[in-house]
Amino acid sequence: MAKDIKFSENARRSLLKGVDKLADTVKTTIGPKGRNVVLEQSYGNPDITNDGVTIAKSIELKDRYENMGAKLVAEAAQKTNDIAGDGTTTATVLTQAIVREGMKNVTAGANPVGIRRGIEKATKAAVDELHKISHKVESKDQIANVAAVSSASKEVGALIADAMEKVGHDGVITIEDSRGINTELSVVEGMQFDRGYLSQYMVTDNDKMEADLDNPYILITDKKISNIQDILPLLQEIVQQGKSLLIIADDITGEALPTLVLNKIRGTFNVVAVKAPGFGDRRKAQLQDIAALTGGTVITEDLGLELKDTKIDQLGQARRITVTKDSTTIVDGAGSKEAIDERVDTIRKQIEDSTSDFDKKKLQERLAKLTGGVAVIHVGAATETELKERRYRIEDALNSTRAAVDEGYVAGGGTALVNVEKAVREVKGETTDEQTGINIVLRALSAPVRQIAENAGKDGSVILDKLEHQENEIGYNAATDKWENMVDAGIIDPTKVTRTALQNAASIAALLLTTEAVVAEIPEPKQSAPQGGAGAPMGM
């Protein structure tokens, strides 16, 4: 296919148009007075959301050059979401601010490479200062505040704080749809291990790229499955019962994996395959843990069991299983309390007898998985549209809270980014262009607070001017229209979220500013259908 190429100013101007179209859509959602965006769906009702990354991913522009600019900003949002789980709108606002200011200077004749160096220096100084002014998360109230700010709901904040209190900061917390209108928390037997699906064609939710299985059977084995005939009788029985299946095996190779995938795609039955966790003897022990939790039997030669002889009553069961590309979460396994308690006692005795610190650590991890349980947040709402929107907010809040536990928190509402301006001003560029790059980041740091104020119906410049004359952590609370200490008021952002948003915005913006040519495909003209006579129109 033929290509069209744009150079220098023309290329950058087209990219900037795409950046602006996406950012102008996303930034309306930032802050407590942010608006919602309605997204058309290919089928069903439209989605209503204020989740930055969801909006960014859904935007596809008609102009190919503009679309490339939009997609690069969406990448900054997506990377921020992948690392920190939140802050996608902040990343988008910062990217637009840096790109816009940078484009003006490049057009005026500044060297984009020098500007890039200045942007990198300023970003490093800002990130270092963020870590210096960061507070550690030490109480349940602080956890609740982080979650409440992210979700714009004190009820959600309290719910997530309760969940973390019950299963620990590193515990497994999952989010499910409720059958009622209330959002509630429950703790059930369950565990999570670090193994994901063997094929992305096994996913059931394409938006989140995860596979959800309700009331599935679980085949647990330490063997490799390469011949589908070994498990065919078992599969046929599962299909007849209309059940789904999770296979945990050493590996699935040969014809077995494509056969399972084909049956999943055709809708014969819902199946997900994952590799067994751990290695060597630890793998066998972990499989026994899973068997105890789910009421299944490990199919292993150690017990004289063969795959081809496996019966349905040797399979484990659970109320729900969620598999992502990296992990598998088993919720509410069907194992008896006696079997689980016996397994727990065995592991505790092994911990007492162990002389190796490494072995003790691994045994304690297994013990925590068996005894800690899984916190399940059941999200309720009156309509499906409201349910989706509420679920997005709770997922963001949970991710924010985990990020705050990792790296602490700073004053929210864009206040922390303005507070680090002083440290950035102390950075001096070696050249005029470097200094220009530093100044670009300086101006961009105030973009989130401006936008939060404007979304609340205030003049962003007036709010910013007043903020720059306040002490650290004193900021504008857009929710109450008051000036107060943001940390004391519970308006806090995870340091990890703020840091990641700034770093990704600076990285993508620097790439855009140093772009000299853009190549796009020229779409082939559609061939017009031959004109018919005066007869009847053709059918589909």
UniProtKB/Swiss-Prot annotation:
**Compartments, record wording:** Cytoplasm
| Reactions accelerated catalytically | ATP + H2O + a folded polypeptide = ADP + phosphate + an unfolded polypeptide
- Residues involved in ATP binding: T29, I30, G31, P32, D86, G87, T88, T89, T90, G413, N477, A478, A479, D493
What InterPro entries does the record point to? Chaperonin_Cpn60_CS (IPR018370), Cpn60/GroEL (IPR001844), Cpn60/GroEL/TCP-1 (IPR002423), GroEL-like_apical_dom_sf (IPR027409), GROEL-like_equatorial_sf (IPR027413), TCP-1-like_intermed_sf (IPR027410)
Where does the UniProt entry say this protein principally localizes?
cytoplasm
Any Pfam family from its record, for instance, is Cpn60_TCP1
Cellular component per GO? cytoplasm
Q: Which GO terms describe its molecular function?
A: ATP binding; ATP-dependent protein folding chaperone; isomerase activity; unfolded protein binding
Give the Enzyme Commission number.
Answer: 5.6.1.7
Looking up PROSITE patterns in the UniProt record yields: CHAPERONINS_CPN60
List GO BP terms, alphabetically: protein refolding
Cytoplasm is among the record's keywords: yes
Keywords annotated in UniProt: ATP-binding, Chaperone, Cytoplasm, Isomerase, Nucleotide-binding
Cite the record's note on assembly: Forms a cylinder of 14 subunits composed of two heptameric rings stacked back-to-back. Interacts with the co-chaperonin GroES.
Q: What does this protein do?
A: Together with its co-chaperonin GroES, plays an essential role in assisting protein folding. The GroEL-GroES system forms a nano-cage that allows encapsulation of the non-native substrate proteins and provides a physical environment optimized to promote and accelerate protein folding.
**Record-linked NCBIfam families:** GroEL, PRK00013.1, PRK12849.1, PRK12850.1, PRK12851.1
Q: What's the family?
A: Belongs to the chaperonin (HSP60) family.
Protein name listed in UniProt = Chaperonin GroEL
